[in-house]
From Swiss-Prot:
ATP binds at residues 192-200, 271. Keywords: ATP-binding, Kinase, Nucleotide-binding, Serine/threonine-protein kinase, Transferase. GO terms for biological process: intracellular signal transduction; mitotic cell cycle. The lineage of its organism: Eukaryota, Amoebozoa, Evosea, Eumycetozoa, Dictyostelia. It comes from Dictyostelium discoideum. GO terms for cellular component: cytoplasm; nucleus. Residues 591-604, 757-769, 823-850 have a biased composition (Basic and acidic residues). Pfam families: PK_Tyr_Ser-Thr. Belongs to the protein kinase superfamily. Ser/Thr protein kinase family. GO terms for molecular function: ATP binding; histone H3T3 kinase activity; protein serine kinase activity. It comes from the Eukaryota. This is Probable serine/threonine-protein kinase DDB_G0286465.
């Protein structure tokens, strides 16, 4: 399974990298070394380090593609063979598996290059192994901890690693003549580190030394034998000085790392490890060497800089014969060496502790198990009397880059594990990026990432930043600029896993789980350790953590005193403080609040990052918002003072543009340092708010000549002029909103979401109210919904409804019968066509007929109401009165002569308009033929409205149905009187006629009123002609018995009812449809009697009553269920109590029985003891009687013997008594 990075890290020419030069193989002939120092080491093929020449290690090593090792012939050597390129060939382990020819004395540290040197004359009898002898290193952790390391690492090997403890003074004294020949010298001022199977010591490279290839080996050997005792004796005296030197040196390179950087170039760390299984190519030491080689590929190809560089490596073995060493001297030497050992660095696998869940490792060797067994037997057969060591024991030496600031663990202890936000960002980003690029290239997994395995080094003298660049598909770059105090180096790869270009996997065989590629394991373990680190909350912390590339920083007015000074000083300090620092306010409380408001969001982002580190792969974490501030390029970041890293290995020409702050009073506006030279430019915009910045940019015109005073530290001039105060005030408001949206707490976000949801709910409720769900009707539609409760619907319609249909106005209420805006236009066209036809017919009519015919309604209203204010006139409507009946309705303004044929034996009164249903049947709608008339009466002004019952006339004389004004005035002449007489006759005839309605109750009725007009007076606003009708749900009754029942109702009740309606309509004059409950207006309920439920002339509400009954039954059932449940619970509780009581009684009874039984047994035991005592007494008596030759108790003796048991009988049988007894 390979990890493909699709978002942030793009696969480029990752394998097309230049070859990495290294040391070549040279024969072992004529090699020389210094006798006392460990300065001359050799490679795996026995090449001397003296022949390497000068090693050019510079700060530019991160940006260069090659390192040149100038040696014999000035040839460039390859670190990895050409066979190991991506050609499908496997890795060549032949150099690793070879037995080394280089030998050294473990007791004195002398190196020898000749296996033929026979030192048989040396007496080795004086050297004895002391069981209590300490090694030259100590275990950092307890011995009981389980280590997943290679086998034989824990074996006690009788090797004194005094090569690490040679005193620097003795080296100078004994090698004063040959100091120039030493290429490397041990730096004894620096503490050595050690672990389970090896140690780490530090050497210095003498660049000014001359290469002398000829050394006197004989003199060296003699000096080694003669000065061994001096070496061991002087260690006691000089160790105390070394401790003090280390303390001073340690503080100097941690705190003054930049000053000592030149010295660090010539300092290297040599990691010496015991090769437990020399013929196993997957041994721990070999694995680490292979992994370091391939990680160097990333370093040399400019893809990473967060791994320690492997300078060289070599193998060595101790000599077969050891020199003479006294026991006391060896003990002193070992004791002195232990004082110089501290926590492990570069090799924390010596102290690695793993969980018990890991599996044990199983070693599979290429050459069999014979060599493995031989190494085991050799290490175990070393006795106190023998000092000979077989050549199978080997040591691997890795020359690594030196980290002058120690481990992250040491750095954290010195600082009490308190880091600033900028330090945390640089630390986490470097760790995450190094894992991301190594996973991309080699599927690398560390498997042991903790604070002890993270090294810290200072920046080189001429470097200040690390610029990481990732090229996207569109040609642009993602840039991250990391600065600060240190560079992170991940070390110790003894337990790591890597996939080679030849698809061969290098992993720990004792842990099968490590063979699988797990991208989250390293960060998962590392994130759990981050909880130890605390974030400093200092007022001088930089504000770049919350800025973006195009963000504008604006300070408050209260911080004017410190804005210029703080920002100018911070811009030249570092990348984390490139922007303005936090202002110092006068009040400490305000300052603390401001700091918390800016730091808390970063802390929240940090906690989110820690959570996501446990789930997401490293390459996705690079785009986390916690690292957004790293995308801002500081002003002092240049290609010369930065280490450039690219994900594809090709350093681009493009470099991120820095930002230069411009100051204008209390405000800071960040703009590019090299803007386009134009006369008019736009105001800097933010990525989030585009609309606001566009408005501002239109109003701003910046002159070409700058009129702005730059701070003294800034050398870049800007052609921008400061904006006006109004523009800045506008921009401040916008920026505050933006900052609030950027740094929102989780609680605030939840509150805003809740507020938004509430607003949405309110909008939905408003829409529902408009659509009619709450009882109101929208302006474009009139929807009458039938409800099961006995509501009274009051319909209002405006004066526009009396004439042609028109869309609703804002002042008037909703139109009765209006369906939608589209239907309005259709109805208007139909009415206009019908009006044209009517006009042609009216011109042909006679004058007599013209008197009886009403003019158009608007003209009629003006004529009858405004001109005749004192007269009462009855006007009928020409419009649709929409009812909740499902059947469609037709309106007839002037009924033609053909309509009476459709309605036989019935004519329509002259004063009533006609509403006729369609005769065409429809699906789901009953076929009905009904005629309903609705007269409306207007008194004095249009806001006085009266209702009368619609009646049908059976006058067959009226051949044509004509709509007339019905006048009750005395001024009217004979025509009006005749009409009144006709109406009286019609009333008598209509008593027998029934108004049939829909059986389902979808019908309307009009409340009867007396002839007195004052009974039904309802007041409305002026200029609003509105009428209302009262309708009921469910079954509705006709007229037969309705009149008789309503006669029983007194006028007082009617007056109360209509007064209540009048008050309601005054409160809600423009409401389209309002629902009035009978409970709210009890007087209205008396108008609709409920005595006769099944009769045709009463209001029957069977459905409601059924529902009420069902609801009551449900409630009763629920109550019964609850009661039953309560009873069951009580019964259960009683049963439980009874059971507990029974158990208690049984326990008590058992205890009593046990006591009684014990008493009974004790009584039996006492009785038996008493019987035995009696027997003993009797036996004594028998013995006495025997002496006296008498036996008076023979019978009793036999009887007691039977009771005692068979034991006495057996004795008696075996030894019978005398006859005398």
């Amino acid at each position: 399974m390979t990890l493909r990075l699709d978002t942030s890290l793009k696969r480029g020419a990752s394998r097309n990298i230049p070859p990495i030069p290294t040391f070549s193989s040279v024969s072992n002939e004529n090699l020389s070394s210094s006798p006392y120092t460990s300065s001359s080491y050799y490679s795996s093929n026995c090449e001397s380090l003296d022949s390497i020449g000068d090693i050019s290690i510079d700060s530019s090593v991160y940006s260069s593609s090659e390192i040149e090792f100038v040696g014999n012939g000035d040839k460039k050597k390859n670190f990895i063979n050409n066979n190991n390129n991506n050609n499908g060939n496997k890795y060549d382990f032949s150099n690793l598996l070879e037995t080394p020819k280089l030998k050294f004395s473990p007791s004195t540290g002398r190196t020898k290059n000749n296996n033929n040197n026979n030192n048989n004359n040396i007496n080795n009898n004086n050297y004895k192994k002391n069981d209590n002898q300490k090694k030259n290193f100590k275990y950092i952790e307890d011995n009981e901890s389980d280590y997943l390391d290679d086998e034989n690492d824990e074996e006690n090997v009788d090797i004194d690693l005094s090569i690490l403890n040679v005193n620097f003074k003795i080296i100078n004294e004994n090698n004063s003549q040959n100091n120039n020949n030493n290429k490397y010298q041990i730096n004894n001022n620096m503490q050595k580190t050690g672990g389970r199977n090896g140690s780490v010591f530090f050497v210095n490279n003498n660049n000014n030394s001359n290469n002398n290839n000829n050394n006197n080996n004989n003199n060296n050997n003699n000096n080694n034998n003669n000065n061994n005792n001096n070496n061991n004796n002087n260690n006691n005296n000089d160790n105390s000085n070394n401790k003090n030197n280390f303390k001073n040196n340690n503080t100097s390179y941690t705190h003054n790392s930049n000053k000592n950087n030149n010295e660090n170039k010539n300092t290297f760390a040599i990691k010496q490890q015991l090769v437990s299984t020399p013929k196993n190519k997957l041994s721990q030491t070999y694995r680490e060497k292979v992994i370091l080689e391939h990680l160097n590929i990333l370093i040399e190809s400019n893809k990473a800089c967060n791994f320690p560089k492997l300078i060289n490596w070599y193998k060595a073995a101790p000599t077969s014969n050891l020199s003479n060493v006294n026991n006391n001297n060896s003990n002193n030497n070992n004791n002195n060496s232990n004082n110089n050992i501290t926590n492990s660095r570069y090799g924390s696998n010596y102290e690695d502790i793993y969980d018990d869940n890991y599996y044990d490792e199983v070693d599979d060797y290429d050459s069999g198990k014979e060599e493995e067994e031989s190494t085991k037997t050799i290490t175990k057969t070393i006795t106190t009397t023998t000092a000979s060591i077989k050549p199978n024991i080997q040591y691997m030496h890795l020359i690594l880059e030196y980290a002058n600031m120690g481990t992250l663990k040491e750095y954290g202890k010195d600082n009490n594990f308190e880091f600033t936000i900028s330090q945390m960002k640089s630390l986490l980003f470097q760790v995450i990026y190094s894992l991301a690029i190594s996973q991309k290239e080699f599927e690398f997994v560390h498997n042991d990432l903790h604070f002890g395995n993270v090294l810290l080094t200072s920046f080189p003298v001429d470097k200040k930043y690390i610029v990481y660049q990732d090229k996207l598909d569109n040609g642009e770059f993602n840039n991250w600029i990391v600065g600060g105090d240190f560079i992170v180096k991940i070390s110790d790869f003894g337990l790591s896993r890597i996939k080679l270009p030849s698809n061969e996997i290098i992993y720990n065989q004792r842990n099968d789980r490590s063979k699988e590629f797990c991208f989250y394991s390293d960060l998962y373990s590392f994130s759990s350790l981050l909880n130890k680190i605390k974030i400093k909350e200092s007022p001088s912390s930089s504000s770049t953590t919350s800025t973006s590339t195009s963000q504008v920083l604006i300070k408050s007015d209260s911080d004017s005193s410190s804005s210029a000074s703080s920002s100018s000083s911070s811009s030249s300090s570092s990348s984390s403080s490139s922007s303005s620092s936090l202002p110092k306010s006068k009040n400490k409380s305000n300052r603390s609040k401001d700091n918390q408001s800016k730091l808390d969001p970063e802390k929240r982002l940090l906690t989110k990052l820690k959570k996501s580190m446990k789930d997401l792969p490293p390459y996705k974490l690079l785009d986390h918002p916690f690292f957004d501030s790293l995308k801002v390029c500081p002003n002092d970041c240049l290609p010369l003072n930065s280490i450039r890293i690219s994900t594809n290995g090709i350093v681009p020409k493009e470099f991120p543009k820095p930002l230069s702050p411009i100051f204008e009073k209390n405000n800071i506006i960040s703009i590019p340092s090299s803007p386009i030279s134009t006369t008019t430019t736009t105001f800097p915009t933010t990525p989030t708010i585009k609309s606001t910045t566009k408005k501002i940019s239109k109003t701003i015109v910046i002159p070409s000549s700058p009129s702005l005073a730059l701070p003294p530290n800034l050398s870049v001039k800007s052609p921008f002029a400061p904006p006006s105060k109004k523009q800045l005030q506008q921009y401040q408001q916008q920026q505050k909103q933006q900052t609030i949206s950027m740094f929102k707490y989780d609680d605030e976000e939840e509150k805003e979401e809740e507020e938004k949801e509430k607003e949405k709910e309110k909008e939905k409720e408003k829409e529902k109210e408009e659509e009619g769900e709450e009882g109101n009707i929208p302006k474009e539609k009139l929807i009458l919904k039938m409800t099961p409760k006995p509501y009274i619907f009051i319909h209002h319609f405006s004066p526009n409804s009396l004439g042609p249909l028109s869309p609703p106005s804002s002042t008037s209420s909703t139109l009765l019968g209006a369906l939608s805006q589209e239907k309005f236009e259709k109805k208007q066209r139909q009415i206009q066509d019908s009006e044209k036809v009517n006009k042609n017919e009216e011109e042909n009519q006679t004058k007599d007929d013209a008197d009886n015919i009403s003019p158009p309604l608007p003209h009629a209203i003006k004529k009858s109401i405004y001109n005749n204010k004192n007269n009462h006139q009855k006007i009928s409507t020409n419009t649709i009165i929409k009812t909740p009946i499902k059947a469609p309705i037709k309106t007839i303004t002037q009924i033609p002569t053909e309509t009476p044929n459709k309605i036989p034996n019935k004519t329509i009164s002259q004063s009533n308009p006609v509403i006729i249903r369609d005769e065409t049947p429809q699906k789901g709608i009953p076929f009905e033929k009904k005629v309903v008339s609705t007269p409306l009466i207007y008194k004095e002004r249009p806001h006085f409205v009266f209702l009368k019952k619609a009646k049908l006339s059976s006058n067959s004389n009226n051949k044509e149905n004509i709509i007339n004004f019905h006048n009750n005035n005395n001024n009217n002449n004979n025509n009006n009187n005749n009409n009144n007489n006709n109406n009286n006759n019609n009333n008598n005839n209509n008593n027998n006629n029934k108004d049939s309605y829909n059986e389902k109750g979808n019908a309307t009725s009009y409340c009867n009123g007396d002839d007195d007009d004052d009974d039904f007076k309802i007041d409305h606003k002026e200029n609003v002609v509105s009428g209302f009708l009262i309708e009921k749900d469910h079954e509705f009754i006709g007229d037969k018995e309705n009149s008789k029942e309503k006669q029983k109702v007194s006028k007082r009740v009617q007056d109360k009812a209509w007064q209540e309606l009048n008050a309601f309509l005054r409160k809600n004059p423009t409401q389209g449809v309002s629902r009035i409950k009978s409970t709210d207006y009890p007087a209205l309920s008396d108008l609709f009697p409920k005595k006769k439920r099944c009769s045709e002339n009463n209001f029957v509400f069977e459905k409601e009553k059924k529902q009420e009954k069902e609801n009551k039954e449900k409630e009763n059932k629920e109550k019964e269920k609850k009661q039953l449940e309560k009873q069951k619970q009580l019964e259960r509780e009683k049963l439980e109590k009874d059971r507990l009581e029974k158990d208690r009684l049984e326990k008590e009874q058992q205890e009593k029985d046990c006591l009684e039984r014990e008493k009974f047994l004790e009584n039996e035991r006492l009785e038996k003891e008493q019987e035995r005592e009696k027997l003993e007494k009797e036996i004594k008596i028998l013995v006495v009687s025997k002496k006296n030759r008498t036996n008076p108790l023979q019978k009793d003796y036999d009887r007691y013997i039977k009771k005692v048991g068979s034991s006495l009988t057996e004795k008696r049988a075996s030894k019978p008594m005398n006859d005398n007894i």
